[in-house]
Every structure is written in C-alpha cells, then in structure tokens.
Swiss-Prot record:
GO cellular component, one term: nucleus
SMART domains: FBOX
Annotated Kelch repeat ranges: 169-215, 216-265
Domain F-box: 8-54
Organism of origin: Arabidopsis thaliana
Keyword entries, A-Z: Kelch repeat, Repeat
Coiled-coil ranges (or none): none
Protein name: F-box/kelch-repeat protein At3g23880
NCBIfam families according to UniProt: F_box_assoc_1
InterPro entries: F-box-assoc_dom_typ3 (IPR013187), F-box-assoc_interact_dom (IPR017451), F-box-like_dom_sf (IPR036047), F-box_dom (IPR001810), SCF_F-box_component (IPR050796)
Length: 364
C-alpha cells in the first residue's frame, strides 16, 4: 500500500459514519484494542448507544459455529459459574472453560435469570439480590435487594429477563405463587426507574409448569411453559412493550398425550421440546413469533431417558443439548450423541447462551 492510500484510510480521514459502520461489525476483542488507535475511536466505542447497536448487529450471526461466533455458553452449578465459547464446543478437541467465581465475590448459589445483549442477570440466594453481569468485559451491577421473597418457603418465585425496546429499558419479571395455589402475582423491575411495580394482566387459571425454569426472551417477549384449566399445555407470554400477559398455543402435538414440554431459543426463534409417552422427543420452532401456523417440527430425538433443552443448532444440524447432568451434542444426520461435551462443565445445573458484547451493566 503506497503512502497516498495509507493516508486515505487512516482513522483521521475516514468519515465518522463509515468508521462507525466498520467498527460495529468487529468482535469485542478487536474493539477493545482499537480504543487505543485514536481519541475519536475511543470516544465512539465507549458510547452506550454504540454498545447497543453493536449487540443488535452481532445477534444476526447467531447461527454460526465458526471461530468468529460471538456467542458463548454460561453454566451454573451449586458452587460454580463457568463459561465457554460456542465454537469450541463444536470444533475444538479441548474445550477452554473460564471460571468466574472470583469475579463474583465467591457467592455460593447462583440462579441465572436470563441473558440479553450480553448481559447475564442472576439471582443470589444468600442475600436475595439480583445482579447484572457482562462476563465478556467483566463488569457487574447489583440491581436490587429483592423484597419478593421472604423466609416463608411456601412462596415460589420464577423469573425472566429481557429488553423493552419501546422504553430502552432492561426489565426483570417475577412470577410469585404460593405453593398449592393457582393464583400468580406478577412484579416487574425496571433498571431505568430502579423500582418494582405490580402487573395484573396475568391470565387466571394458568400455572407455570416448571418453576425452576426462567422465562425465554424472544422478540421483546418473555415466555414460560404453562398449564391451564382450558388446555393441557400452553405458553404464557409477556409482551414487554405492551406490558401485558397472554396465552400462546403450542404446536398441534401438545395435546393431552404430551406429558411435559420445555421452552428454549433456537436461532432467535421460540423452540419447544414435547415429550409424549412411547414416542420421541420432538423439537419444534415457531418461525414467526406469535403466529400459531408457523410452528414447524425441526427434529425428533429418539431414546431419551432424561429431559433436554436445545441451546444451539449449527447449519449442519448438530444440536447442543442441555441435560440435567451436563451438555451434549446430537448429530441429526447419524443419530449419534457426543457426551459430555467437556468434563469441565459436566454436572451443570443450568445453562444459558449469551452474546459477547460491550454493553455495560453500569450504564443502565
């Protein structure tokens, strides 16, 4: 490259709009280095709006399992919080696992509420608090001391975490239910307003099926598997912009022959695993959220003796599955399992996929 060309493409001569479009498509590691190029780059990359735009663009690459994949998996057990890259689970002979216990002050009981734009929301048992944490840039923020729970073990709280685009606000949704009662009370926490408020739109007669499972964030909504008095299985969906709950029907398979189901997120689509007695575990995806006709069966997994939840699917239809005892890969082409994916993350109690971004919990 001659001197004239080099001068033309120097940071000082690029239009700001062009420079931003280029930087928005780079991984976090590169952006961190490029902060040192010049003051204008550092200022741009440090902006809160830039971090959000960057996260939204990265979400479009969700299907890839290449080394450029911006996604990772966070796993929890009773005493440990670990993470690894999606691409290493699929492609590496040795999976590099990061341990994050020291970053989180050694807290001993984690429940991951959900992930959104690279932020991991988790609940800590010992102080009944909610935290936001970005494992990529290693920053965390305490949201609130959750007054939702008391020493009364009869109250069960189920959480969800997502982003309300209409208000530019990250929110935590809590569903509170007294044991042996059907009625559910709902509370919404706003990170912008720093307070909890009540919501009264939860449908009557609906019960969350698995209270240990957090809501699945899809397209501005949070979703839980549920049962209702009118049907065997249903989905309860909270629209964050409209601030309302409603029921969504599952695929046609989810009748009374289906004894349980789990929800997930596959390639940005709501997914559902249906277990029917004497049959396979069927994995469905809702290709257009909210449209019942768009449910499509993606695959069937035979011979399962444990409940699973798909976390990821590659272009080659190799599925990353979360079992109760760890993670496994299932190849749809030959029907083979690879288990465990890594001994370092075997025995995990919960697993969530997260995006590697620069969104800071301290800027909310």
């Amino acid at each position: 490259m001659d001197e004239t060309t080099r001068e033309m493409f120097s940071p000082h001569n690029l239009p700001l709009e062009m420079m931003e479009e280029i930087l928005l498509r780079l991984p976090v590691k590169s952006l961190t280095r490029f902060k040192c190029v010049c003051s204008s780059w550092r200022s741009l990359i440090s902006e809160t709006l830039f971090a959000l735009k960057h996260a939204l663009i990265l979400e479009t690459s969700k299907a890839t399992t290449s080394t450029k994949s911006p996604y990772g998996v966070i796993t929890t057990s009773r005493y440990h919080l670990k993470s690894c890259c999606i691409h290493s689970l699929y492609n590496a002979s040795t999976v590099y696992v990061s341990e994050h216990d020291g970053e989180l002050l050694g807290r001993d009981y984690y429940q991951v509420v959900g992930t959104c734009h690279g932020l991991v929301c988790f609940h800590v048992d010992y102080d009944k608090s909610l935290y936001l944490w970005n494992p990529t840039i290693k920053l965390q923020q305490r949201l609130s001391s959750s007054d939702l729970e008391t020493s009364d073990d009869e109250c069960v709280v189920t959480y969800g975490f997502g982003y309300d685009e209409s208000e530019d606000d990250y929110k935590v949704v809590a569903l509170l239910q007294q044991r042996h009662q059907v009625k559910i009370e709902t509370k919404i926490y706003s990170t912008r307003q720093k307070l909890w408020r009540s919501n009264t739109s939860f449908p009557s007669g609906v019960v969350v099926a698995d209270k240990s499972r957090s809501g699945i964030y899809i397209n501005g909504t949070l979703n839980w598997a549920a049962t209702s008095s009118s049907s065997s299985w249903t989905i309860i969906s909270y629209d964050m912009s409209r601030d309302e709950f409603k029921e969504l029907p599952g695929p046609v398979c989810c009748g009374r022959g289906c004894f349980t189901m789990t929800l997930g997120d596959l390639r940005g689509c709501l997914s559902m695993v249906c277990y029917c007695k004497g049959a396979n575990a069927d994995v469905w995806v809702m290709k257009e959220f909210g449209e019942v006709y768009s449910w499509s069966k993606l695959l069937s997994i035979p011979g399962l003796t444990d409940f699973v939840r798909p976390l990821w699917i590659s272009d080659g239809l190799v599925v990353l599955l979360e079992f109760r005892s760890g993670l496994a890969l299932y190849n749809c082409s030959n029907g083979r399992f690879h288990y465990p994916v890594s001994n370092s993350i075997s025995g995990c109690r919960d697993a969530k996929v997260y995006l590697k971004t620069m969104v800071s919990p301290n800027d909310l």
